[in-house]
Amino acid sequence: MAAAELTAPAQGIVTFEDVAVYFSWKEWGLLDEAQKCLYHDVMLENLTLTTSLGGSGAGDEEAPYQQSTSPQRVSQVRIPKALPSPQKTNPCEICGPVLRQILHLVEHQGTHHGQKLYTDGACRKQLQFTAYLHQHQKQHVGQKHFRSNGGRDMFLSSCTFEVSGKPFTCKEVGKDFLVRSRFLQQQAAHTRKKSNRTKSAVAFHSVKNHYNWGECVKAFSYKHVRVQHQGDLIRERSYMCSECGKSFSTSCSLSDHLRVHTSEKPYTCGECGKSYRQSSSLITHRRIHTGVRPHQCDECGKLFNRKYDLLIHQRVHTGERPYKCSECGKSFSHSSSLITHQRIHTGMRPYECSECGKSFIHSSSLITHQRVHTGTRPYMCSECGKSFSQSCHLIKHRRLHIGEGPYECSECGKLFTYRSRFFQHQRVHTGVRSHECHECGKLFSRKFDLIVHERVHTGERPYECSECGKSFTCKSYLISHWKVHTGARPYECGECGKSFTHSSTLLQHQRVHTGERPYECNECGKFFSQSSSLIRHRRSHTGERPYECSECWKSFSNHSSLVKHRRVHTGERPYECSECGKSFSQSSNLTNHQRIHSGERPYECSDCGKFFTFNSNLLKHQNVHKG
């Protein structure tokens, strides 16, 4: 029963052929030196592990337990299936001899590094390669390949490896080895002499005493688990970075890592010119241009170009959030989100703008911010040509064209394109005004409105027009003003064809056609089509005059009246008649004046049908009928 328990797991041991990867000569020619080096290291590691497991070497068609790996087979392992042609050889970079196989080259080059020749412990004969040494040793002891599971069990339970450095030393004869796989084979050669033990005895002692691995005290109940652990210990991280001290198991991994310090990015995309440190990163990037997304989610069918992205996405369906913040307990689906979140607690802002010194938590936030300095607006609306610095702003803008308003007020049914506007609107119904001006005590529903209002008292106008020098208290006023110079009126009324510079102005105008007056005064019940009109009207009840002239201290109920009044002191007359050149301080005065040239008389008397140029003239005339 114990013996069966031990041998069962071994049935799943793989051979070298199961894990080997082959290239055609055409594919092999496309690899750079670093990739060939990596392939070389990986194949040697795979060969070492399959040999330690007792699996067959390259090209072995027999079952793993029916034949051990001979030294000749190990030294003759091929790289690509198309590679072992006699015409295809590998030159030694030091002395120039041409060797037919990759592993022959490895053993040959070991002689250039001061390694010992392999010596037979019995007759002290020196041989250059371990393959020849093992062939020679068979002449002394008449060894044959072990075929019983008992022999394999004893081999696995008696091997002790030195993992502290190279070369590897056999404790039976004191012989040194350069290649790990040769060391494993030497150990197997010694254990074959002890094959008189039975499988049941091995099983009994193996169950009673768990397998222990050299200096590592970790214990295992099954051989295949122990051997896997041994493989991890064999993979010594012998390549260390001189910059940061980080170690790697292969020279290629170290080469890739060194590019972090040198900033070298040798792999460039032919489509967009973007460069990468590793060829695998370039291959993944190219899928953006080709549209290839080979990894599909079984739950929703969504496609991904990287397997890692698919694994992260699948956590949306499973609800898995394995990364937990130790500060607040919040969990995340991937580690990068946790790292970014932890910056909230530490206050770290690693991404700094080189222009203004402002720092950010996310690199994406820095990229977006830098567009303020460069003026880049990569996201353009296909309907009106307006461009935006962020994609989210373009998405919101598109709703204006399609009439989409995803945010609906439950009180009045009004739809809003932006969530912020929706929240602002809800305060109309609730009456919440939590932001108070310390100068005049006025309340505002938004802090931003309070900040803009305070500039009335301070006189601050930080936003100046580069065309005419006019300044404004908030940026939105400046943006609106710019359209005076550009003449842009992208918003057109479907009823009368009139166009407007702002969508909000169009909405207000459309109420002229619909007759809608949604804003009601709580004092007198009067309705208004615009909220600003209601606000101005309320001041007639309260007597509030928040806008004060700094010259004569006269106050006004609305800002536009103050602006008009200031022109009395400055003498400014910005509105000029194109017919006679006469200028006016108010646009309404210019409109009335232009009727003199056009002959327009829009005001009609309802009693006699007479027309007048000005409303004031009509009012005077109506007194005639009243008698």
UniProtKB/Swiss-Prot annotation:
Which keywords does UniProt give here? DNA-binding, Metal-binding, Nucleus, Repeat, Repressor, Transcription, Transcription regulation, Zinc, Zinc-finger
Q: Does the keyword Transcription regulation apply?
A: yes
- Residue stretches in coiled coil: none
Superkingdom of the source? Eukaryota
Disordered as annotated region, ranges = 55-76
Q: Which SUPFAM superfamilies match?
A: beta-beta-alpha zinc fingers, KRAB domain (Kruppel-associated box)
According to its UniProt entry, one GO biological process term is:
negative regulation of DNA-templated transcription
What positions does the domain KRAB occupy? 14-96
Location (main, coarse): nucleus
Please tell me whether the keyword Nucleus is annotated for this protein: yes
Spell out the Polar residues composition-biased ranges: 65-75
Zn-finger (C2H2-type) intervals are: 90-112, 239-261, 267-289, 295-317, 323-345, 351-373, 379-401, 407-429, 435-457, 463-485, 491-513, 519-541, 547-569, 575-597, 603-625
Give the transmembrane region(s): none
Give the induction note: By GDNF/glial cell line-derived neurotrophic factor.
Pfam families in UniProt: KRAB, zf-C2H2, zf-C2H2_15
* Position of the signal peptide: none
Q: Name one GO molecular function term.
A: RNA polymerase II cis-regulatory region sequence-specific DNA binding
This protein's domain notes: The KRAB domain mediates interaction with TRIM28 and is required for transcriptional repressor activity.
Its quaternary structure?
Answer: Interacts with TRIM28.
What protein does this entry describe?
Zinc finger protein 256
Provenance organism: Homo sapiens
User: Which gene name does the record give?
Assistant: ZNF256
